[in-house]
Amino acid sequence: MNNVLILCHRRGWNKLTNFILGLKKLDYRVTVVSDEYLTGDFNQFGLDKADEVCINENFNVEEILLHTPTADIIYSISENLLPVQSQLEKHYGLNNVSEYAAEILSHKDKFDTYCRDIGLGKYVPDSIVPITPSDLNMFNDRAFVIKPTIGNGTKRYGTYSNLEYYGFNNKADFLKYLKLNNLDSFFDDNVEGFIKPNFNNVKYRLIAQEFLDGTKGSHAPYTYIDHDSEVNLLWWFKMEMIKSKDHTERFEEQVYKVSSIEGDIEEELTNNILYFLTTLAKELQLKNIFTSGPEFFSNLKMFDINPRPGNGMNICDAVNDNKIWPQILSEAKADIQNHYVWQQVQLKPGKVKEVGDTSYLTQYADGQRTRPKIEPGSTIPEFSFIVDPDFCFPIITSGKNRVELGETVIRQLQDSISYY
């Protein structure tokens, strides 16, 4: 296996950082197909290390085949590109992801239904694509979240962007929000579906999914499913969420801390997560594919399997002298010597009057994000989320005292700021 083809949207370039480097260390020839070319980000995310980078706005299979007539393995960095991968694999004589598997893995509603059909229903949150208000009766006055059936929690788009990845306390609050915001055509529009240009123009609808409270923390694995459809556990990580409310009907919950876990997690949770993944891999006959999840909660329900490399894999590689990716790719394991904490900085909100020296932050900054300016006159929001285009401020700490170090860095920054 010498020729690697990577399918990646421009917005997913951050997941290529160190991944391409790891492949090159093993002497693979790497071709990246992306939908956009931005010179300023090219070197930052490691694309300069690829042998070729081809721009194909619509990921047209015929055009990709003309340029790249052969490949030994394909990695999709976004699940909505799995259908493209499955079509290419037929031409290349590969069988890692079938067209059927790609369809299941790239649509949340189809994934939930499939899991129920193969006996994994107890792990799947209640969900439905609502086309009438009565469809929401299934939640019995419980909270639920509205999501596109494709994509992830950082990409909102279109008429209903103010619904996507937001939670509602119950059906009544959701209907009230629709009325207050002149979104009465929601159910009719959801029958027809929507198109996202930046998701390869795949038609999707909006799904209502049982709200799983992540403020108490959830656990997930990074895994590599090998050529025998065996699930190889790489390491566990914990996710912690923060919940905000912008008014009485709608709330938002987003990740603010992700920590790699040293050792194992609770046995029952381990057994259930690995059973879920093993069953799925065997039933769909998945091969040579990464997963960044699924994320499991204390009630043993899950969401978002994320069948692709995750950002934490690049972070782990970076804080371990770029030794992790080559090990994963060659041995399907990860010998982690240096664990990490990634967290969104949460600061006291308000208008900044003065700020001291912050140059020390450079060594902790997530280099894949543009650090917001904290300067006299700038405003610090009440909550800092990764989806916030104006104030996304994550830091990375690693080593034995990584937790305490992160707390110290944030406290030092907070103490250096005065407010009006």
PLM region spans:
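A short catalytic or substrate-binding loop motif that flags glycine-/basic-rich loops and adjacent residues
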Residues: 151, 200-202, 212-217, 285-288, ...
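N-terminal beta-alpha lobe that positions the nucleotide/phosphoryl donor
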Residues: 50-53, 61, 67, 71, ...
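Glycine-rich phosphate-binding loop of ATP-grasp-fold ATP-dependent ligases
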Residues: 144-190, 218-220, 241-265, 313
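Peripheral (often C-terminal) accessory segments that flank ATP-dependent C-N-forming ligase machineries
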Residues: 327-420
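Conserved metal-phosphate-binding beta-hairpin within the catalytic cores
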Residues: 277-314, 340, 344-352
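ATP-binding N-terminal substructure of ATP-dependent carboxylate-amine bond-forming enzymes
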Residues: 1-101, 404, 408-419
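ATP-dependent carboxylate/phosphate-activation module, predominantly the ATP-grasp catalytic core
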Residues: 213-279, 306-335
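Phosphate-binding site of ATP-dependent enzymes
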Residues: 175-245, 268, 295, 299-301
